[in-house]
Amino acid sequence: MDFQLTDEQRAIEDAIGQIMSDFGDDYWLERDCDGGFPEEYYQAMVAGGWLGVAFPEEVGGSGLGIADACVMMRAIASSAGAMSAASAIHMNVFGPKAVAAFGTDEQKQRWLPPIIAGEQKTAFGVTEPNSGLDTGSLTTKAERTNTGYVVHGRKVWISTAQVADKILLLARTTPKDECERGIDGLSLFYTDLDRDYCDVREIDKMGRKSVDSNEIFIDALPIPADDLIGEEGMGFRYILQSMNPERILIGAEAVGIGQEA
């Protein structure tokens, strides 16, 4: 197996390096002190088309793969921005992969182009305070209504929820005790992060203040039926299409930070 970068991947590194050179130590120190989202940096990445690196061309993406996205994220993380720069965008790189894989053509066209164009930001609503890594034990509940679903529950350690317009939300549609396995009965939605029904509370951290971490209290959030991805009850299988790339990209980011150190 050849582990050398291709010419195209080296071009990705060089292009990212050019962008990151405009955002040095002073920029990231200021963001980490005042806690403001790095919007200027985010829009520079949008302008270069980098949020669509791993998405199909038919929705405005570049049609490249996760290996290419890893090259990009490693280059970002090896800059002055380190994990702050990487985590400001990586949800928008890996999170919607479940939409690209399992969404209808209408959903893909409705949801993916605004992310790639920087018109909408999204959050990843999976982790809960009482389930941790045991996703099958999450308790956020989506109940059917005449027009779709209504959701009650709680999520924690949700990045960028202060600025997100949308949320990729995993919720239980069938009680766990009625399922053969805990991972059954979960459904995946991509919907508005509506503050009228979602109380988003930022969690203070020792670092990476420019990328907010949050607890979200969800009280009767209405979700249209058209915002359900795929089949009801198959959400855990779908979310793996986002979670697996996330782990790979975070590994690449760690390598980038280590190389720069």
Question: Where would I find each of the regions flagged by the language model?
Answer:
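A structural signal for short hydrophobic beta-strand segments in well-ordered beta-sheet cores
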Residues: 140-143
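N-terminal glycine-rich flavin-associated loop
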Residues: 84-106, 132
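Glycine-rich beta->alpha junctions and the first turn(s) of the following alpha-helix
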Residues: 2-8, 74, 78, 198-261
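Glycine-rich phosphate/pyrophosphate-binding beta-alpha loops
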Residues: 132, 156-162, 245-249
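A short, Trp-centered hydrophobic/proline-enriched beta-strand micro-motif
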Residues: 118-126, 170
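Short Ser/Thr-interspersed hydrophobic loop/turn segments at strand-loop and sheet-helix junctions
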Residues: 49, 72-77, 171-173, 191-196, ...
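Amphipathic, small/basic residue-rich leader segments at the start of a protein or domain
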Residues: 1-87, 106-110, 114-117
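A short core secondary-structure module
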Residues: 148, 152-201
